[in-house]
Structure formats: C-alpha cells, structure tokens
C-alpha cells in the first residue's frame, strides 16, 4: 500500500478546517415552520390568548410572493377590540406597509423569508388581529409583541370563514423561535440575502399549487436542476439559512477536492497541488461563493470535476489491460459536464475548452499508434524492405489494439458529452414539468411542447434575468477579475452601533502575486519558445500554462456573453489564476539544482503567508459578520479602488 505523503495530510487538514469553520458559521437552522398560501382579498384573523393585550408591534415573515420579481405588495395589519368582531377586517393599526418581491430599488437587502417589522410606534389595547395583503403569497409566520417587546400568545380565530383553522395555525407554529434582538441585529447568520430569497422562491415553485392570477418564478440565472439540488437540504432542514446554504457549501468543498486532484495530475506533484488548493481556500472567492445560497459554487464544482476526469484521460489514455475502466474517466467527465450545462447553459463555454483537452487526448492515442507501428517497420516496405509474417501479425495486433482504444475513446466521449447532456435535460424537464408549465406556460391551456419548455428554461439561464438590487451595482468588466478593483457585495446592513458588508473579493495580496506570476510565466514560456527548448520539464510547464490560461479565458468569455458579470461567476477563474503562483515556483525547478528548489519553496511559502495575512484582514467580508462603527477600515483590504 502506497504511503500517504505529508502534503496529502496537509491538504486533508486544510479541507477539515474549511469544512468545520464553514459549517459552524454557515447560518442558523431555525425555521419558520410551515406556511399557508394567502389569497388576495381575504383576511387572516387571530385572537390573543387571555383577552386584551397592549399591542406594541407586529412582525411578519412572508415567503414567496406570486408576482413578478421586483413588484410591490402592500401588507395591512388591522385590529379590533369588539366582543363580536367583523371577520373581514377591523381598524388599521398603521398605514399599509409595502414590500417588494425579492428586491426593491429603494433597498438592497432581501425581504422574502426574512422577518419584517410592519407596525411600530403605536400602542393599542386590543384582542383581535387581522392580516391582509394585495397579492397572493406564502405567509410563513406572524408575531405580535406587547409594548415591552414580549411575544403575545395568539390563536387562529375560530369565527373566521377565510382559510381553515389548520391553514392559519401554520402561521403560528414557530412563535418560540422568534428573537427580536436577532431580527434587529446586523447579521447574515439569521438573514437571507436577496440572492437567497430568489433561490427560496424558486425552490417553493417546484412544489407550488396552481392558483388563478399567480405569477410563478424560478431563478432566471440558472437552470432548474440547480434549484433541485438545493431543494433537497431545504426539505430535510426546513426553510432555514443553513439548509439553503448547505448544498452550495458542500459543492465548494468538492470543488476544493477536485482542484487538488487536478493540480496533482497537472504538476505531477502533491506539493504544488497542496499549495494551489491552499491559495484557493484563502483566495476569498471560492470561500464566499460557497456560503451564498445560490448555485454558483455547484456549477464551479461540476466544471472542475469534468476538467479533472478529462485530464486523467489525457494523461493516462486508454489502458491496454483495462480499456473500459480507463474509459470511465470520460463517462465521469461527461456526467459532470452535463450537470454543469444543465445548471447554467453558458457552462458550455468552459466545457468546450475541456473538449479541446479531450481532442488532445485522442491525438495522443493516434500518435502512440503511429510510433508503435514505426517500431515494427511500417513504412520501411517503401524503401524496398519486405515485412515478414511475424511483423505483419504484430502490426495487425497493434492496429487492432489501438483501433479498440479509439473506439472506446470516441464512444465513451460521445456517450458522455452528448448523450448524457441530452438525457440530463430531458430527465430534469420530466421531473420539473409542472413548475416549468407554471412559469413559462398557461396551466389551463397548454401551448408549449415539452421540448419548448426545456429549451426556454435553458435560454433563460444563458442570460441575466433573475436580477436583484445588487446585480447592476456588482457588475464589472471580466478583466477587473485580475485585480480586486471592486468588491462584490451580496448583503449589507447597519445599525446604530454596527456595520456589516458580506461579499466576495479576490484576496488582495494573492491577486497581486497571481498577476505577477501570470506575467512571469508568460515571459518564461515565450522565452522557451524563442530558445526552442523542448525538454520534458519545459513541455510540462507549457502544458500547464496553456491549460490554466484556457480555464481563465473560458470562464471570462462565458461571464461576458451572459452580461452583467460579477465575481460570483469567477470561482473557476480564481482557482486557475491562483494556480499561476505554484506554476511560477515550479518553473524555478527546471535546472534541478538545490538552490533553485529552495527558491521555489520560498515562493510557495511566502505566497501562502501573504495570502493568509490578507485573508485574516478580510474576515468580516468573507464570513459576513458585523464590526463596530469606527472599525470600517478593515474593508480597505478587500479592494484597490473602492469598498
């Protein structure tokens, strides 16, 4: 059994820290429980337990709103003190409260699935409470507080004919979990961001019932498969912040593993693979993307998985002894590629770059066949040399062997990258047929075919359509990804004493080092071409250089084509960009002298130290925790130009 090297143990330690700190700070598992479907024009009525109470404020938690993203909805809270109250309404407690579906041009923070104080500043003595809204929506929870801020126990009013007793009880099943201090504090631990409000809305659409006059929404930035993946953990843990962020976070850890394995294969070194994974973990982008309840990290993990298995095929080829087993690399690669494209259609751009690597792998098989035949004398008969029977049999055997290898490569490649992609789209379309009809067609009169629904959803994810208030503000040229010129914020909040800015930015120190390493290796590779150096180390350096450069270019093109690119789409880019630092270090080992090896180690360890320092300085942004006013200067470490 092969001994596990120290750098593999070091990577496992980094992965363990990544998982433990991430899971511990991911978010609360508190859920608002079940929800009821509120129909516009009706009234939800409650009665305070124990008679009249001095009502101080009312908080509501509204989930999915069946209107277009960005539309405004009014919420009215009324009260009554009569012994025989009207079941259709009472006296307005305060003027109507307005909230927008997912986002508002007036505010950046998400409202859906978060607690909102809809009345305050007016204390009345009352016994009955009414809820009304101007749109159909999911009412998750409603809480009434007395003038001292204590929860007032209440029950559904039995005299009301609107909605059943069981339906109204669902809006009171998490009263004990309400904490007004948590609601008012600036935090991401208990709060859904706008991106996450959109994700929760899409998840709810998967199981939504059809109601007249409702508008149903999916996350327009991604295919419905990504919503299915996140729906699993929400089904297990409930409508909580932790549940929504769990799938993307696990995906970010998987991406870290695939990056390590890919670089171990690329560099032929556990040391360089470890430092690449470490720099990616400290880089900021991969960490934060995995902590946002949106599919970005899942797409990145699928692309890295596809790249890893394709490179295994490229480097190892098809084995003569176990051709089907080695060909399975292509099946795994195609499966991950299919998942990536089904989650985000423009993943087809990086997948196309991966297919180029597949083409080079096939070319290697042809080249190996040619060399094997030349060794047996093929071509010499043209010089007047006859081949004996033994040579002819050997040649026939080589042709049969490599013919089988080529058939395995092409059949597995075609099955993986074409058939699996088509199957994935069709399977997801069949599973999610009803929600696709709700979003894109008319339930009563079907006008779109099954394939049209799938195609429309795929086109949706190829453009920026699921906008939030942060989308435009976070937009920057893909070339700005080379340096942290602009921090991408997904949630900001401030109270009288605290300020919070949760976002992602390429680690400033690492970004500068990566850019220098990119320029250095570019000059180094160009110098090798000029000098016509062609030794084994030089060829490996060039191969790694062009693979990393292709990964960066492919993700930049995909984001640019989609429009409004942000760092949320730069996970694969940041991994490839950070890998140039180990590549620059490896280039110093080409002469194989002890001094050069020491220089390479200095580059690696010094770069890791610099990245760790800037990572520590940027913790409030990466992990999304608040700092006291007066300490906002910590955010200057996240960007060169502005924060």
Regions of interest found by a model, annotated:
Residues 2-45, 184-187, 356, 362-366, ...:
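Transmembrane helical bundles and short interhelical boundary loops of multi-pass, membrane-embedded
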Residues 184-195, 207-227, 466-472:
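Membrane-proximal lumenal/periplasmic loop motifs of glycosylation machinery
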Residues 220-228, 237-254, 500-511:
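Loop-to-helix entry region of an early transmembrane alpha helix in multi-pass inner-membrane enzymes
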Residues 242, 246-267, 305, 517-524:
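Transmembrane-helix motifs of polytopic, lipid-linked glycan transferases
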Residues 248, 285-298, 345-346:
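Short acidic/glycine- and proline-prone juxtamembrane loop motifs at membrane-interface regions
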Residues 258, 298-321, 336-337, 573-577:
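Specific aromatic-rich, kink-prone transmembrane helix
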Residues 276-281, 337, 341:
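Short helix- or helix-capping micro-motifs
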Residues 306-331, 340, 362-369:
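Membrane-interface transmembrane helices that cradle and orient dolichyl/undecaprenyl
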């Amino acid at each position: 059994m092969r001994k596990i090297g120290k750098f593999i143990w070091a990577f496992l330690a980094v992965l363990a820290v990544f998982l433990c700190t991430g899971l511990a700070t991911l978010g609360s598992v508190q859920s608002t429980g079940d929800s009821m479907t509120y129909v516009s024009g009706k009234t939800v009525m409650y009665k305070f337990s124990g008679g009249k109470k001095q009502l101080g404020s009312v908080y509501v938690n509204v989930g999915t709103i069946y209107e277009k993203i960005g539309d405004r909805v009014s919420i009215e809270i009324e009260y009554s003190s009569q012994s025989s109250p009207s079941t259709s309404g009472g006296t307005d407690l305060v003027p109507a409260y307005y909230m927008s579906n997912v986002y508002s041009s007036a505010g950046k923070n998400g409202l859906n699935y978060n607690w909102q104080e809809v009345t305050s500043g007016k204390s009345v003595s009352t016994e009955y409470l009414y809820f009304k809204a101007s749109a159909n929506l999911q009412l998750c929870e409603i809480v009434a507080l007395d003038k001292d801020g204590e929860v007032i126990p209440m029950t559904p009013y039995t005299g009301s004919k609107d909605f059943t007793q069981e339906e109204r009880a669902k809006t009171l099943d998490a009263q004990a979990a309400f904490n007004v201090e948590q609601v008012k504090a600036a935090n991401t631990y208990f709060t859904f961001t706008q991106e996450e409000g959109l994700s929760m809305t899409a998840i709810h659409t998967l199981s939504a019932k059809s109601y007249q006059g409702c508008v149903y929404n999916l996350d327009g930035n991604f295919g419905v498969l990504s919503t299915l993946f996140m729906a699993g953990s929400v089904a297990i843990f409930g409508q909580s912040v932790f549940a929504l962020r769990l799938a993307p976070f696990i995906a970010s850890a998987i991406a870290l593993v695939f990056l390590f394995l890919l670089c171990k294969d690329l560099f032929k070194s556990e040391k360089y693979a470890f430092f690449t994974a470490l720099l990616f973990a400290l880089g900021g982008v991969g960490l934060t993307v995995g902590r946002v309840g949106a599919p970005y990290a899942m797409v990145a993990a699928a692309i890295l998985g596809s790249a890893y298995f394709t490179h295994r095929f490229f480097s190892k080829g098809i084995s003569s002894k176990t051709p089907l087993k080695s060909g399975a690399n292509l099946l795994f690669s195609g499966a991950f590629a299919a998942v990536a494209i089904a989650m985000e259609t423009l993943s087809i751009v990086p997948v196309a770059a991966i297919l180029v690597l597949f083409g080079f792998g096939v070319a290697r098989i042809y080249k190996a066949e040619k060399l094997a035949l030349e060794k047996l004398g093929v071509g010499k008969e043209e010089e007047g040399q006859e081949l004996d029977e033994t040579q002819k049999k050997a040649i026939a055997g080589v042709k049969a062997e490599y013919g089988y290898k080529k058939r395995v490569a092409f059949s597995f490649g075609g099955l993986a990258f074409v058939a699996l992609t088509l199957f994935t789209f069709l399977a997801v379309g069949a599973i999610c047929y009803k929600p696709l009809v709700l979003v894109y067609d008319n339930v009563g009169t079907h006008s779109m075919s099954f394939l049209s629904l799938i195609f429309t959803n795929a086109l949706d994810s190829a453009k920026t359509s699921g906008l939030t208030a942060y989308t435009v503000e976070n937009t920057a040229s893909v070339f700005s990804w080379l340096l942290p010129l602009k921090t991408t914020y997904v949630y900001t909040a401030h109270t009288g004493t605290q300020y919070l800015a949760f976002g992602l930015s390429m680690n400033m120190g690492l970004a500068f080092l990566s850019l220098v390493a990119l320029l250095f290796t570019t000059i180094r590779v160009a110098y090798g071409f000029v000098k016509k150096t062609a030794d084994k180390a030089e060829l490996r350096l060039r191969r790694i250089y062009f693979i990393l450069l292709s990964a960066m270019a492919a993700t930049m093109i995909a984001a640019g084509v989609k429009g409004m690119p942000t760092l949320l789409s730069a996970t694969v880019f940041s991994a490839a960009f950070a890998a140039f630092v180990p590549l620059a270090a490896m280039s110093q080992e080409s002469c194989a002298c002890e001094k050069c090896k020491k220089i390479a180690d200095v580059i690696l360890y010094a770069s890791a130290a610099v990245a760790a320092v800037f990572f520590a300085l940027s913790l409030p942004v990466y992990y999304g925790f608040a700092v006291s006013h007066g300490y906002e200067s910590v955010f200057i470490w996240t960007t060169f130009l502005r924060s």
